[in-house]
Amino acid sequence: SCYTLDALTEVLEWNNQGTPADELACLWLAYLRWYRGMGFTPAAHAPFSLDREIDTSAPLTAREGPGQATLRALESGEMQTVAQNINPDALVTGALVRSCAFGFLPVAPERTVVLLAARAAALTHGHPEALASAAAYALLTRDVLAGACGSEQGKKNSIADSVRRVIDWCGSIPAEEAFPADAAHTREALVKALALQETEPTPEAVAEHFGTDWLCYTVLGIAVWNTLYCSARISASGEGLQAGLMRAVSADSDSDSIGAITGTLLGAHVGTLGDTQPLLEKLRGAADVRAVADRYIAQLGQRP
């Protein structure tokens, strides 16, 4: 996610200097630098780009179980697309978890977010449902953040309202090149999460209702369930947030990804309310992540 956001920052840097930039090219180069930063050797024919500030961060370039589909795509040295992809059946979570950053884009057209998230997902994952789940996550992040930062009425909207809107989107995807198939599995997972929002997502309940696979739409559904359950129980002081995050990473599935998605959505919803700041400071690499965010905000014309 941090490398995705840094790529979008680079696009803004070029634009602010009066030079148009190719978003997808910046994203691909960022992922190749991340691949290189983890100690892998890119293909000889892969394009090279100079290091950026993010590449000096040890926590953000630590090799912590990167997915095989992601590594295979980046190892090829060829830019993958929706139409031609080295991983046509890839349904795991590598593309999903890095897509939240597209929800931070301050653009009015929803279609811009959807297409960019889908095409960025296709850089490593080719299955249509992987593209759809990535776009759904980006849209959900965007909607939750808009509610938290908008009018007082908007702030009263629950995460459940945002989930319902994304479910509607999943059921109305137009037939176009970005999505060679519908988002039926992603929609089903979100519908199930919404129906279960009053049920505690214990590891046993998660296994019963979602199973233990590591598929992108399953992981998104579990994370949204955790988010819905936790968000309704966080006090004004932030009490309950840590318990919700601990619950998220206890699932017998891709718990890292479930925790990351849950944390992103809860963070977008509640911000740094109450006593959450000490919790944030405990995170490894927190300063590095904040620096990435500050550079993005600075390019938007705001002071960090």
Regions found by a protein language model. Give the residues of each.
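Structured, active/binding-site neighborhoods that engage oxygen-rich ligands
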Residues: S1-P304
